Amino acid sequence: MIVEIPKNSANKYEYDGKLGVFRLDRPLYSPLHYPGDYGFVPGTLADDGDPLDVLTLMSEPSFTGCLIEVRPLGFLELVDSSERDQKILAVPKSSPRYSEIATVDQVWPHMRREIEHFFTIYKELEGKETRIEGWRGPIDARKLILDCRQAYLDAKAETE
């Protein structure tokens, strides 16, 4: 994954592919912070037209632009302003702290609720609604990543 927003940030950064830089999209309207490093899987295209989103559990934040090799545990399915959206939940492959966590079901229940809560309310003050649909496991996450990779390759082939 490529980190756009480090853990504990209250700013939403996005990668601008046309300019090749990370830019500030907006500060969060709510007094919240991202519960993990947040970014995207390069070379993917999700249903929302952007690369597939990833939230990586971290003890300490990394930095914007950091490449982290991750292991997907599953994903959170949600509806964001009437659009389907998925957030892969992952852990760094190199971290011994998460070596025994293989699926989203093994993530501490309170941490899962914190993540759900964040994605439920982080856009409320912007007047946007987000609804949680549930968690899916690592097999579904790998399939989602492969499907989004294929969508990216198909879109790229159409423009060449």
Q: Would you name each region that the model predicts?
A:
Residues M1-E160:
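Hydrophobic N-terminal alpha-helices or hydrophobic patches in metabolic proteins across all domains
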